[in-house]
Amino acid sequence: MTTDDYAAYIASLPRVLAGAAALFRDAEGRVLLVEPNYRQGWALPGGTVESDTGETPRQGARRETLEEIGLDRELGRLLAVDWVHGPDRPPIVAYVYDGGMLDEDDLKAIRLQESELLSWRLVAREDLPEHLLGALGHRVLAALDVLADGTGTVELENGRRVG
């Protein structure tokens, strides 16, 4: 195989996107959500992993957290990995990391990325399904379960446990 053949082969491979987010909670266990201005529903702080620059999912979650809410935090363990099929885009592998607990000073320090976000709020577990649409809602609930029961990373497909 020549170099050109190999390049053509690589270009022909299926495309998969990667996203990463941080799951932050307050002392009451409420989850920090952000409201994007470019789509319906709410989300965790996070976004697309810039894999073309060599960024890893963990680095992407930390970078996006800093960009979106102004907090630069070392992230904890990987809570969930979710393979998500979506309309009008390639599949995405979504990583959720433990962002840890936010105290009052952390909450006061939040500065939204106004070009992408409208607002933020803390949401109780029982209210998450009305804020987080589709697989994202299931993913966040599964990540909270991992934190609560101390189990290892959960594997998901479209927000549902597998294996």
Briefly describe each language-model feature range.
Residues V49-E74, D82-L136, V162:
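Unchanged
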Residues A142-G163:
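Charged phosphate-binding loop/patch that engages nucleotide di/tri-phosphates or the phosphate backbone
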Residues R30-V31:
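Hydrophobic "anchor" residues
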Residues A43-G46:
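A short gly/proline-enriched turn/hairpin at secondary-structure junctions
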Residues M1-A21:
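Acidic, metal-coordinating catalytic segment for phosphate/diphosphate chemistry
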Residues P36:
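Short loop/turn segments immediately following the C-termini of beta-strands
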